[in-house]
Amino acid sequence: MTNEKCRVLVHEDLGSGYRRIVFDAPAIAAASAPGQFVHVRVPGLEMSALRRPFSIFNAEDGKLELLYKRVGRGTAVLNELAVGAEASVLGPLGHGFPEACDGVPLLVGGGYGVAPFYFLSRRLMAAGHKPVLFVGGRTSTDLLALDRFASLDVEVRTATNDGSAGTKGLVTDPLDKMLAELRTRGERFELFACGPDPMLKAVAMRATGTGAKGWISMDRHMVCGVGACYACIQKTVRGNSRCCIEGPVFAAEDLVW
């Protein structure tokens, strides 16, 4: 874990309130793994003891890339951070996704829950795997970074509630179709998920119900980010766990819903 003063290299609008920011962060980028997160303190909030947590979208060549949505005071201030400005970034933090996979990696993201899967896809592909990404949202503008996954040649299947892109319905609809295809062919698979709780529970149930491994990134309100305050508790079969230390990624079989 490093507290690094990082300069903004890129900060751009993705539409519908979503943004992409890239920091020059050589120490953090070198130590980061898929599924981990960073805590950012932005100019204008220096009087606050609290940082804001963000999933790592990518870490490569000394650069740290994040996706976020403007939803509160912290992200509103971050939204105004110009190229060339600096912010204090603490990380990498948390327990991420495993990068070894027994079978076909099926990545399931809801909205900006897709954030950790670009980095994970890169690592899985480097290990010889061919991940399949399932992305869901209310409408087509909630499907983020599809061009980036296309640049990796990742197979992407989409779903939207309003039918404006991909399958009309839930992201678990195309997922279920893929699971049926894999079972018919006798192929093994592992599930990886990040997004809203109902989706996470649905994916976890599919993992435990089929005997497959499942890895679930839980989204909980974080305060300190380093395990001291116990604000980000997740119930597991072993008792209460901290999302910032034991998580945010947990084995599906360990979660209590």
Residue ranges and their predicted role:
Residues 2-83:
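Ferredoxin-reductase
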Residues 10, 58, 158-160, 216, ...:
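Structural signal for conserved beta-strand scaffold positions within catalytic alpha/beta enzyme cores
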Residues 45-54, 94-101, 244:
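Short, Lys/Arg- and Gly-enriched loop/turn segments at beta-strand edges
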Residues 73-216:
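FNR/FR-type flavoprotein reductase catalytic core
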Residues 197-198, 219-248:
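Local cysteine-cluster metal-coordination motifs and their immediate loop/turn environment
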Residues 245-257:
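Short microdomains enriched in Cys/His and/or Lys/Arg
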